[in-house]
Amino acid sequence: MLRTPLGLAIALALLAGCAAQQSLQAPPAHTLIAPEAASGWQDKQGWQGRDFMVAAANPLAVEAGYQMIQAGGSAVDAAIAVQLVLTLVEPQSSGIGGGSLLLVWDGQKVAAVDGRETAPAAATDQLFMKDGKPMAFYDGVVGGRSVGAPGTVRALALAHQRYGKLPWAALFEPAITLAEQGFVISPRLAALLAKDPYLAKDPDARAYFYQADGSPKAAGTRLTNPALAKVLRTLASQGPDAFYRGPLAEAMVAKVHAHPTNPGVLSAVDLASYRAKLRDGLCFDYRQSRVCGFPAPSSGTLALGQIFGMLESRDMAALKPVQGEQGQPAASAEAIHLYSEAARLAFADRNQYVADSDYVAVPVSGLLDKHYLARRGALIGERSMGLAKAGTPPLAPARGQDATPELPSTSHISIVDKAGMAVSMTSSIEDGFGSRLMVNGYLLNNQLTDFSFTSLDTAGLPVANRVEPGKRPRSSMSPLLVFDKDSGELEMSLGSPGGSAIINYVGKTLLGTQDWGLNLQQAINLPNFGSRNGPTELEAGRTPAAVVETLKAKGHEVVLSEQTSGLQGVQRNAGGWLGAADPRREGIAKGQ
């Protein structure tokens, strides 16, 4: 590895950060998939910076991004360094074996860099069928069958080509240093290792994550990852093509095909032909802000645009938070009722109409049409509607319903640099530990299970999100950039992990900042709530009992669960930038 003066400075900073890892984790003054396991609550008040801010899911990753900006790098440079470190220290959630959606504001335009995985050329709509029926969900997840062509490396390279300031190789140095010299297993990673029943069946993962007796390595154990360090050195010196062609690509393909019970069809040609795509951001207005995010294949911004389009006529500001458990603010029953009913309607439309727009016509303008949303919003009454039906927006094609579960392991990064460039990036390998296949020190995704397992619904209509060769599965990832509607000034960067619950985690946070006058950290801290067109989901242990009973009286089927969001964000304030991180996970923010 080239040891430049910049690289040496970054390496020293990262080693210092590694030594202080534990202290860094504390802040300054219908078909339902269970949320990712909780790992405790750490009170967080937010982090203040004047000139720039980095927020991410792990302190070591935040330190890497911070050092890049201090060295003169852009927000995109910092995001790349953060993601590479997350591959190492938060392997259950994201990494180079997965995909990413990266939203960039350069002061002129919102660009959407699409690094979503693609289905192999040999994939068919029978991929997840067995004996004429959809296979059990985890029978599809674990093994090579679920692995799509990873997109994160290509997406990072495309973003760097357009917006980077530092040399590509320099961005790899923090992750290489940590991989070679070691990092400490965090409590969250240790807890997830202890709960996962599949990962240890992979020999490479077992050797890395588990003791000789089969028990998971404990929190506080120092891990080195020389195999990943070697991969990162190769990518640093040879560029992204080295990931998609040659020995690294061949190793991925071999791993996918070698699974003893559930091999996949990913090929060397699939990897060599993968390209990240540059798309225009999708925006909608709410109150005094313009909210911008990702278009299809993401469903997140479109669903949020529908939800808030239906809520625009409601006086949500009057429905102030109530006193919750431990005296902390919590949304009122009426606010949860209105939001959750709007979310039911949006999810019904999402499940019917949204998929990869390169393969199916997504009626975006119709779904966001104000008259259509007014009609949909008028369906919200005093009592819960239960299961919502999809509407018929203008120019909508006939489509079948698809309620494919979307699993909750993902990571979010928000960064604003000294020049005002902003990044909102959500990255994922899909389920916790992805396909449970480890190759060269990193885990491969299981993103193909985000497709519908069936190609037709019960009425015989084609499902928009069915498996097709080369197609990108629908996502709920919702990286957002929020602007003042009149001045155009950037207000916030935010997003979250959480599978399809991402939409509600981010939606709750927008309600807090846009309607209730909360700062971003306060809004993130609110108990989570929402519906995915099934039961009304409320955060266990933090939602007031009176709120639960009122919702039940309104006809809501209530489910209390951990609701482990992982929101990160950056918000403009009078002092510069407020960094915010979810108290439900291990993230922090750091700026200057």
Residue ranges: model-predicted function:
Residues 23-63, 67, 75-245, 250-295, ...:
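Noncatalytic scaffold domains of N-terminal-nucleophile
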Residues 278, 407-410, 475-477:
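Short, small/polar residue-rich loop motifs at catalytic or cofactor-binding pockets
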Residues 88-95, 101-105, 109-112, 262-267, ...:
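Active-site rim segments in enzyme catalytic domains, especially the processed small/beta chain
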Residues 32, 316-428, 437, 582:
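Internal maturation/activation junctions in enzymes
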Residues 470-472, 506, 515-562:
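Extended C-terminal subregions enriched in glycine
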